[in-house]
UniProtKB/Swiss-Prot annotation:
Signal peptide residue numbers: 1-22
UniProt xrefs under InterPro entries: BamD, BamD-like, TPR-like_helical_dom_sf
GO biological process, one term: Gram-negative-bacterium-type cell outer membrane assembly
UniProt keyword annotation of Magnesium present: no
Main location: membrane
Gene3D superfamilies membership: Tetratricopeptide repeat domain
A GO cellular component entry from the record: cell outer membrane
Function: Part of the outer membrane protein assembly complex, which is involved in assembly and insertion of beta-barrel proteins into the outer membrane.
Protein's recorded name: Outer membrane protein assembly factor BamD
Gene assigned in the entry: bamD
Any Pfam family the entry gives: YfiO
Organism, as annotated: Buchnera aphidicola subsp. Acyrthosiphon pisum (strain APS)
Length: 246
């Protein structure tokens, strides 16, 4: 009986020691992790984005995905990757964040960064070095930014970023309407008057408040005259006169 009690006692001591060690390990793990996270924040404040990313990726790699702080780590990574223009990694983290945290209180920030990335990609830094009008280049990312910004403004009307989003949408609308106007002029030069009218009407529907859309009216008017559709041409002439479009 004594021997049996001794075995139980030894087992209890071993179990207690292992529990204490386990708790100590967990405490050290979270302390180390918190220290690293604080260090990454300091690097972000100093704008040492590469250093911050290195630390944050280390935390993310060794972190339990169920941990409550993972959202903060991912938001910081999105910001840091965006700032160093590593848009592929930024978008990868955005997609992960939106999948795991669709109802997060800062989801509007993440979606807004997504809009800014599309705008940055559209600006095409390579062509900005040369005397080339980037409006004539491919505008895939501009269209992305247009729809993303419209979605953002509709989905998050009370967001702190909505004012800037509206300003950016005006910029993108001007960008796209100027691009469409250059295409419209090409059609007009080649006497494709139906195409001019169709393109112009699309511009007026999407970007009616832009200068380029108003200029499109001049080419629409000339196209109707060229097609000998005089009644419509005269109506457009009156609109041009009233709005003082040149």
């Amino acid at each position: 009986m004594k021997k049996k009690n001794s075995i139980i006692f030894v087992f209890m001591i071993l179990f207690f020691n292992s529990t204490v060690q386990s708790q100590s390990f967990k405490k050290n793990y979270f302390t180390e992790r918190y220290t690293l996270y604080e260090k990454s924040n300091k690097e972000l404040r100093k704008e040492n984005f590469d250093n911050a990313i290195s630390i944050l990726e280390k935390i993310k790699k060794n972190n339990n995905t169920a941990n409550i702080s993972n959202d903060k780590i991912q938001i910081d990574l999105i910001y840091a990757y965006y700032k160093i223009l590593n848009f592929d990694q930024a978008r990868k983290n955005i997609e992960e964040f939106m999948y795991f945290y669709p109802n997060h209180p800062n989801i509007d920030y993440v979606v807004y960064i997504q809009c800014l990335i599309s705008m940055s990609l559209d600006k095409n830094r390579f062509f900005s070095v040369f005397p080339i009008n980037y409006y004539k280049n491919d505008y895939f990312y501009a269209k992305n930014a247009f729809f993303q910004l419209k979605y953002f403004i509709y989905q998050y009307p009370k967001s702190r970023y909505v004012v800037n989003a509206k300003k950016n949408l005006i910029y993108i609308k001007n960008r796209l309407s100027e691009h469409d106007l250059s295409i419209l002029k090409f059609y007009f030069f080649h006497k494709e008057y139906i195409a001019v009218i169709n393109r112009g009407e699309e511009m007026l529907q999407r970007y009616s408040e832009t200068p380029s859309a108003r200029k499109a009216l001049i080419y629409i008017e000339k196209s109707y005259y060229a097609l000998k559709i005089f009644d419509t041409a005269k109506k457009i002439s009156k609109i041009i006169l009233l709005n003082k479009i040149q």
